[in-house]
Amino acid sequence: MKRLFMAITLFFGSCLFGFAQDAKTILDKCAASVSAKNGIQADFTMNSAQYGNSSGKISVKGRMFTATTPMATLWFDGKTLWTYMSNNDEVNVTTPSESQLQVMNPYNFINMYKKGFRYSMTQSGNAYQVHLTATDASKRVKEMFITVDKKTYHPTEVKLLQKQKWTTFTIKNVKAAKLSDAAFRFNSKDFPSAEVIDLR
């Protein structure tokens, strides 16, 4: 009886480990699909109980991104974030945290998932859905659901939980691009009348 119990425990343990490995493999392939050397561009929609709703375009190259919505334009060069608010012609300069970046850049999960999360995965139709649960209580992002296209391995939806509120990004029209590093930095020449406020 004891041997049977141990065998069952080992079986289910190995199954759960296998599912976690499969989920990690899917996320690794997903991260690789959006880590093109010269960058990618996409359209996105954000629905958030905490931050409101918006839509726009995003360009990503490694850790760098720029996002444009009707209200704001953001540039992040991997260290510094510039946020231009069109309603008051003002640019705020900050050094954001990873959790802050996550609600600005739906692709930022590729910089987060490898440490501090437990994985599980389901499949539905032409997509994988990977569920990530934080194993570190100090993480501001407690849960994430990443929906990944089975054919392209591009993420089509990123859903994350912060402060007990969900934010959902829907991503479409992904395409490769040739983007220079300069495209991810604010250029004052393009906004000559903007007031720059350094909050670092």
Stretches with model-predicted labels:
Residues N38-D43, K61-A67, N126-H131, T152-E157:
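Short, hydrophobic/aromatic-rich segments at coil-to-beta transitions
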Residues S33, G56-S59, T73-L74, R118-Q123:
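Short, exposed beta-strand/loop patches in secreted or surface proteins that constitute
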Residues F5, L16-G52, R63-M64, D89, ...:
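N-terminal leader/targeting segments and the immediate start of mature chains
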Residues S124-A127, T135-E143, K150-R200:
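Non-transmembrane domains of secretory- and envelope-associated proteins
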